[in-house]
UniProtKB/Swiss-Prot annotation:
The keyword Lipid biosynthesis does not apply. One of its GO terms (biological process) is L-leucine biosynthetic process. InterPro entries: 3-IsopropMal_deHydase_lsu, Acnase/IPM_dHydase_lsu_aba_1/3, Acoase/IPM_deHydtase_lsu_aba, Aconitase_4Fe-4S_BS, Aconitase_4Fe-4S_dom, IPM_dehydratase_rel_enz, IPMI_cat. Binds 1 [4Fe-4S] cluster per subunit. PANTHER family: 3-ISOPROPYLMALATE DEHYDRATASE (PTHR43822:SF9), HOMOACONITASE, MITOCHONDRIAL-RELATED (PTHR43822). Its cofactor is [4Fe-4S] cluster. Heterodimer of LeuC and LeuD. This is 3-isopropylmalate dehydratase large subunit. It catalyses: (2R,3S)-3-isopropylmalate = (2S)-2-isopropylmalate. Catalyzes the isomerization between 2-isopropylmalate and 3-isopropylmalate, via the formation of 2-isopropylmaleate. Pathway: Amino-acid biosynthesis; L-leucine biosynthesis; L-leucine from 3-methyl-2-oxobutanoate: step 2/4. Keywords: 4Fe-4S, Amino-acid biosynthesis, Branched-chain amino acid biosynthesis, Iron, Iron-sulfur, Leucine biosynthesis, Lyase, Metal-binding.
């Protein structure tokens, strides 16, 4: 029987499956953070249970951590309590924790891959919707709720229904200046934010293969934003080169055996998908969102659509509401729109390649008057590498704020947030109402586009900006 990559991964992890029941699957790696885990550990404690396989669970602090200090209380009392509880729970149950002062601390979806905790063929879960990031390695990775976090801690398994299969092929090569963020935003613009509902998506095509692992993580990170359960990219030599010699990656003969297995993790020729979507890479422009979901997106040189031109009444009403919230008229270009803040970071775009791309724009320039610009590395190791390369100095000299690792302004759960009415060019993954702060207006862009907006005070076409 011909199988897709998703089917191979799912079938390899089924522990129990009976007619009329949701399959029970084994979980290879469980990533934990401070927000969705406290009640799960409390549940174990109440029932007198242990963590079944502590070595397969790794925790870090990310959502609530302040990025302007390493003070546990720096983001408020609730954040402090959650981080203190995580430290207490991981110590009691024997789980590895990268706390706020550890060099490996960082956003969970940055920390996992850079430590080699994310490997092809694995099932990976976390109490966070952007767990799909790890699918870039050919792992079946998806977010779970707190009750499921407890179930995985107790049993190393979770109930999971089979999803429909979707293939998204990006044909050909992208043009100069087009990034992974532009690719995935263009995909969501085509599918809409609900186009992948009920599916696991496999991304493929020459443009996807050409991406680095960091670019592939950006693409899979946002699979959830088109409604999918998870995103996948088949592992290849790019994957293996990234993983080799990572701390938790196999070594010696185990590495050779692992690679031999990983090479089988691809969709069989002739395997069938329920849904197929294709894009031409050469047609993708630098992308900017204009509304309140990632599907509200256009190329930088396009005009904001007129809701009156939308045939679907629900789509039309959604667009009207989005434009009212964003304080924008239809039929203008986003190059006419000034911004107040810039956020370069998040589990989508806070890795070293992202910071290099932003620094190439910032070098020798200054942040525009009246604009606050934050650069927040995704982990302690990313920050350390950036400082070795002198990127921090480039940002600081240009007027950007160089911060400590954390989720930061991606979500309003710490001190980095927008004030009502403020407009932000952000490299994060969600532009929902209030996502970055009550009344805040978020535009999703690539790191280079965000840096260009910071120095020009408005959105510009990155292809017209000289890079240093």
């Amino acid at each position: 029987m011909k199988k897709t990559l998703y089917e191979k991964l799912f079938d390899a992890h089924v522990v129990h499956e009976a007619e009329g029941e949701t399959p029970l699957i084994y979980i290879n790696r469980h990533l934990v953070h401070e927000v969705t885990s406290p009640q799960a550990f409390d549940g174990l404690r109440a029932m007198g249970r242990e963590v079944r396989q502590p070595t397969k669970t790794v925790a870090t602090m990310d959502h609530n951590v302040p990025t302007d200090s390493r003070d546990l209380g720096g983001s408020g009392e609730m954040g402090r309590i959650q981080m203190v509880e995580l430290a207490k729970n991981t110590e009691q149950f024997g789980v590895t924790l990268y706390d706020i002062n550890h060099i490996n601390q960082g956003i969970v979806h940055v920390m996992g891959p850079e430590q080699g905790l994310t490997l092809p063929g694995m099932t990976i879960v976390c109490g966070d919707s952007h767990t799909a990031t790890h699918g870039a390695f050919g792992a079946l990775a998806f977010g779970i709720g707190t009750s499921e976090v407890e179930h995985v801690l107790a049993t190393q398994t979770v109930k999971q229904a089979r999803a429909k299969k979707m293939k998204i092929e990006v044909r050909g090569k992208v043009r100069e200046g087009i990034t992974a963020k532009d690719i995935v935003l263009a995909i969501i613009g085509k599918t809409t934010m609900a186009g992948g509902t009920g599916h696991v998506v496999e991304f493929c095509g020459e443009a996807i293969r050409d991406l680095s692992m960091e670019g592939r993580m950006t693409v899979c990170n946002m699979a959830i934003e088109l409604g999918a359960k998870s995103g996948l990219i088949a592992p290849d030599e790019t994957t293996f080169a990234y993983l080799k010699d990572r701390p938790s990656a196999p070594k010696g003969k185990d590495w050779d055996d692992a690679v031999a297995y990983w090479k089988t993790l691809h969709t069989d020729e002739g395997a069938e998908f329920d849904t197929v979507v294709t894009l031409e890479a050469s047609e993708i422009e630098p992308q900017v969102t204009w509304g309140t979901n990632p599907g509200h997106v256009i190329g930088i040189n396009e005009t904001i659509p007129n809701p009156a031109d939308m045939a679907d009444p629900i789509e039309r009403q959604s667009a009207e509401k989005a434009l009212a919230y964003m304080g924008l008229p239809h039929s203008i270009k986003l190059t006419d729109v000034a911004i107040d803040k810039v956020f370069i970071g998040s589990c989508t775009n806070s890795r070293i390649e992202d910071l290099r791309a932003a620094a190439a724009v910032a070098k020798g320039r200054k942040v525009a008057d009246g604009v606050q610009a934050l650069v927040v590395p995704g982990s302690g190791l990313v920050r350390e590498q950036a400082e070795k390369e002198g990127l921090d100095k480039i940002f600081i000299e240009a007027g950007f704020e160089w911060r400590q690792p954390g989720c930061s302004m991606c979500l309003a759960m710490n001190n980095d947030r927008l004030e009502p009415g403020e407009r932000c060019a952000s490299t994060s993954n969600r532009n929902f109402e209030g996502r970055q702060g009550r009344g805040g207006r978020t535009h999703l862009v690539s790191p280079a586009m965000a840096a260009a907006a910071a120095v020009h005070g408005k959105f510009v076409d990155i292809r017209n900006v000289e890079l240093h």
